Amino acid sequence: QLHHGVDPNCLQEAFNQHFSGVSAIEIAMMEQKIIYEDDNDITFEDVLKLCNVHARMFEDQVTGHSAVEIEQENHPVQVFKAENMAFRACINRINNIFKALEALNEDDPSRLDFTDGLKRQYQLLGQFEHHYTRKERVFFPLLEKYGYNAPPKVMWAKDDEIRDLFQAALKQVDLLRSKDFTERLATAKLAFADFEYEFKEMIFKEEAILINILAESLS
């Protein structure tokens, strides 16, 4: 119904009644069935376009997995989650710098210092590339080994979209030293907001779905 334009909010109540306590593996199998079944008119592009909506509908229904090995300190999954926490903190710092820049007069000399600080935070946040590469080279092959081909395919495509959004946002920061600072700042903030939304949605998918599929598969 989502793929035919039905408002997700209209479906959420019925969805919660029928899919209470669904596991991450069940989500993966549903997604796989949608993508690979021949008797439906839903394309991969349709799934990609609505994957954030799909994930959010499952938000309160996904049951976690408390495998002991996943809780061990320095376990790859724990490192993965710690990195996401650091990325969230970096995003908060960037938004705080944007607020500070908006409060300054255009001729305020401290504007350049804040702009430099903003660029440094973008450079730190750009380390998500290592995070994504590890996910794609280590976690995705494990999922495929256990027969879950759809989640890696969808996530990898979204990863590439997020990479493009980050580069677009970074380009706008580089332009902040140009003329028309106020206008440039507004554009830079909007570009970052586009990236931030998709990036945080991916964090949710990683922690609510990807990690749980790995935990259930490896236990």
Question: Residues of each region from the PLM?
Answer:
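Small-residue-biased structural context
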Residues: 1-129, 133-219
